[in-house]
């Protein structure tokens, strides 16, 4: 399954119509998993301890003449002692405008992810058409006052077309539309005690409030597109994809009397190149990715107009008050020793670079980080028994992240707020820490019956992340999963 997905270059892209050019072997799987991590080396909004239990399924098949792929996953994620978030499900999704409080709290989160792809067969004129749909939803609940019930939804549609120029060259085009919405409602279970909270406006700038919080409505859209080029010879496969999309999302206070508070304009450009070569004895895989993401943080000035013609909040002015820019580049190389439809062993290496610079324009504040990551790993696929196709896959890997530069400087008012002293300072310390990771996994698999195609597997993995920077120590991760491929 692992090697099959690596060879399907169009399935890795944003173009569903190109599935016709991939290996069209039918496959499906069902996986149940449990993941646990703890330790003090984490971002301030993450839990000191996090446990996740989930189930996922994926499948690909021919439905008459059409090609169809689909997947579904559900996760129940429990966070313990998470801080500095009292507003949204994911504080790392590129939305700087949310609410924090001074108490660490447990969270109970649920995530649903449903995806499908469909493609026509290759027509006589060399064209194929496809579509991808994605629906994601999450429900999150903070367990300590001020409590939060937040619900996030996104619906994405990606129509696509591809054209076979000749046996070796293919071109593709895909367009993307995505609708985004999140409803956040705060309240105090103990109404006798008011709680302090802070409305974030970027890099530590905040407005303090007291009481039970507020309701916040996040809504927006994302538009974009991608171009693909595929070269397929008898030996080499080369795949190039360039994509660009723009997300515009607004933040409104209150549902009964909406007040436009802030918004973002998020632009992302990505260019990737993938090559795959399968020889008689060895296979090679190389993937390079460059990503640039720029977010403009927009703030609104509004006044309440209770005239008969309006009776609501009127926007007087809006301006870009903060910017968030991230550049990332990575190169991943894999060498495999072939053994029939599987591999005997695999060696992997990766080099990744990232540079982030966030700025609040006036009064000026800045948070930046520049890092480089080295990764090496190896896998050995042992034949435990030829009968029932018994295998034991051993995986060992190690990573090292080196910080090249970084800082956090706050120039605004109220430097004593926890948004400055705790949230942004701790986050900058995490981003600018050196760390190392050592880990491995064992996967045992075998056929359920000698004459059946169903393959059962169980996997256990462990990773240790260590550091001594900024009074951090470690983060340990344990995962156990079981499932079947058929």
Regions found by a protein language model. Give the residues of each.
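Outer-membrane beta-barrel "beta-signal"
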Residues: 167, 474-486
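Outer-membrane beta-barrel translocator domains and adjoining extracellular loop/strand segments
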Residues: 40-46, 81-87, 141-148, 184-190, ...
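Membrane-embedded beta-strand positions of outer-membrane beta-barrel proteins
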Residues: 28-32, 70-72, 129-133, 159, ...
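Outer-membrane beta-barrel channels and translocator barrels
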Residues: 63-66, 122-125, 164-168, 232-234, ...
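Residues on the lipid-exposed face of transmembrane beta-strands in outer-membrane beta-barrel proteins
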Residues: 55-61, 114-120, 157-163, 225-231, ...
